[in-house]
Every structure is written in structure tokens, then in C-alpha cells.
Amino acid sequence: MPDSAKALPQSSTAASRSGLTYALLAFVLWGLFPLYFHALADVPSIEVLAHRVIWSALLLAGWAAWRGRLGPILAEFGKPRRMGFYALTTVLISANWWIFIWAIQNGRVLEGSLGYYINPLVNVLLGVVFLHERLNPRQWLAIAIAAGAVLWLIAMKGVVPWVSLSLALSFGTYGLIRKMASFDAMLGLTVETLLLAPLALAGMAWWMSTGQASMGHLGVTTDLLLLAAGVVTVAPLLCFLEAGLRLKLATLGIVQYITPTMQFLLGVFVFHEHFDHERGVTFVLIWVALAIYTFDALRQHRMHPSAGEAE
């Protein structure tokens, strides 16, 4: 998922309703990602990533041209310091996308779900370490419970849940750097995909020249799914940005749990992944931590309503 959109104050009930509709669309679409990437299980995950980058770059560049924003995007490439930040965020988002695709294709939907459940708490912890933000006792309690849940899983399974931790840390760090650099959400993703596009195109050229490309060899359905990678990536992002303009951040903070919850349900009931006692305890502890964190966030929002307004 992208960094949080800046919320603008809206008093209109109609705006709030449309904002909630956009938010539901965004998080439901993200929640359905396992179905999409699982349908591409016969395509190597790195090749799926390449298609996602190429078609997203084309779609985002077209969007920028339509909105008259090509100028600001091209101007970003002439700013060495900002390009340094972009280099970092590009590596992080590509790693995050690839790990998630790989996880879905290798029967680790539940691990992906866990990663996005703990992501908000990782964001809070990164804020403490790098932005020197201060936490109250309830927030520390939530983080401690989440850390305990991960340690419990490691102790019981004897294996580090690297998929979950990698997804949470890569996306959390991605959001942190974007916040520090004050990147515009859509403009930033456009620059990132344009930076990745040459590598993706080079990979595609290599696979085609060596007869390893999946496009055109695995059937029409697979071809259409690969071509849809750009729409699949950009559509929920656009919905999320529209929601961010109409809803308070506190509302978005609650609705965001739709995505990992849908992924959790898909992992258990659709893909029938193994869900034993150890995993059950881990998820329950994470849910308790998130309940504490969300309760505190809502309490803080009621005490300081302006915290959910635009920065």
C-alpha cells in the first residue's frame, strides 16, 4: 500500500460519504490482490513485477500528461538531493512489491496479511527512532504486545517470519523517507516507476530474446492479466488519494484494516493455508495491539481534532 494522503477539512456530508466510498474501494481492491497475483502463479514473480512496473509507469505518465503535471515530474529528475531520496524509495517499493508477489505465489498469504497488520505499529516505531516522536504508555504497550507476538511465533516455529517483517519494514521505511522528503503521493510513484522502467524493460527484452517470456506463451488470460497490472496498481491508489481529500486521517486509520483482514480471510478460507495454534495466538496478539493503538488514536483525535487535518 502508498504513503498516507494529506487530509483536507471537509464539512460536507456528501463529501464524507464519497470519501468513505473511495476508501472502501481502495482497501477492498488491495485486499483482493492475492486473487490477482495467485492467478499469475505460472509467471515468475520477478517477471510479474516487471510488468507491474512497465504498465504502471505508462499509466501514471499518461495520467500526469492528462493532468498537466509532466513538468513537475520532469523537474524532479533535475534535483540531485531529491533523486537520492527517490533512489531509496524506488528500491524499497520494488522490494515490497516483489516480496508480496512472491509470497502470494508461494502460499504465504497469511504472512503477507500479518505484515500489513503490523505495518502501522512499525510506522509508529520508526517515527520514534528517526523523527524523535514521543509515545504515550498505551502506544508503547501496543508495540510491546506486537513485538511479543512476533517473538512468540519465532519461539514456537523456530523460524523468523521474514515475509511479514520484510513487508512491514520495507513499506514503513518507504513511508518514512517519503514523509521526510515531502513527496507528493502520485507524483512520487510516477517518478519511482519511471526510474524502475528501464530495468524492467531490459529484463523483458532479455526474457523475450531467450524465449523465457511468459507473455504470449501461457494463454490469453495470462496475457490480459499481465496487461492489467498497471490498472491493478494505479486504480486503488487513485481511490485512496480521493479518499484522503475527503476523510479525516482517523477514519482512514480504521478503514485501512480492511486490506489485511481480507487477505487473512482469503489465506484461511480460499487458499486453505495452514492456520495452527501458534499462528492463531500470534494474530490474536496483533489484533489486541491494534485495538489498543486504534483506541488511543481515536482518543487523541477527539482531544485534538486538528490532528486529522491537513499538515
Give the ranges of each region predicted by the language model.
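Transmembrane alpha-helices of multi-pass small-molecule transport proteins
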Residues: 2, 44-95, 170, 191-208, ...
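Structural motif at transmembrane-helix junctions in multi-pass transporters
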Residues: 42-47, 98-115, 238-255, 274
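Helix-helix packing/entry segments at the starts of transmembrane helices
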Residues: 114-118, 185-195, 234-269
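C-terminal-most transmembrane helix of multi-pass membrane proteins
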Residues: 2-3, 257-311
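C-terminal transmembrane-helix exit sites in multi-pass transporters
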Residues: 102, 119-139, 261-280
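Loop-to-transmembrane-helix transition segments
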Residues: 18-25, 72-99, 162-166, 214-235, ...
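Glycine-/small-residue-enriched transmembrane alpha-helix faces in small-molecule transporters
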Residues: 2-47, 148-180, 202, 305-311
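Hydrophobic transmembrane alpha-helices of multi-pass small-molecule transport proteins
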Residues: 5, 60, 138-154, 165-167, ...
